[in-house]
Amino acid sequence: MHLFWGGPDLAVTRFSGRPAPPHPGGIPNLPDWVAREAYSHEVSSCGFWPGGGPISHAAFYSYAYPEPAGFSEAAIQPGGAFYSTDLREFILPYDVVRQSESPDDTLLAFLRTTYEAAADLAHWDRSALERHRDSSGAFLPNR
């Protein structure tokens, strides 16, 4: 978990372990050399944006770099989440989460489905990257 530079968003990033093509840069308030280093490996990233700038309202977001083919068309949950072609990421307005019957489940569905779309479409070795727990909460060995 980290505070993303250039903006006050709180983010979590997962890495595939594979190198990514050089990032083209051009991110506002972020030197190109920093973008190239930050995105030197394939990522699926999600976070919370309090609003302002390109998104006027508070929202959760999720993106992948490099963006795999088909990512923008992936079936993402919950209803209310959408893909922004301007930002090249999925957006879930905070109000959708806040007003849902189960905010935790609503947010988890967004985070889970966007990660799964990124990892599956990019052919990540999920069995080597993910840890699972048994009913007692103990971690199971990787498959």
Predicted ranges, named:
Residues H41-P93:
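Low-complexity, glycine/alanine/valine/leucine- and proline-rich hydrophobic stretches
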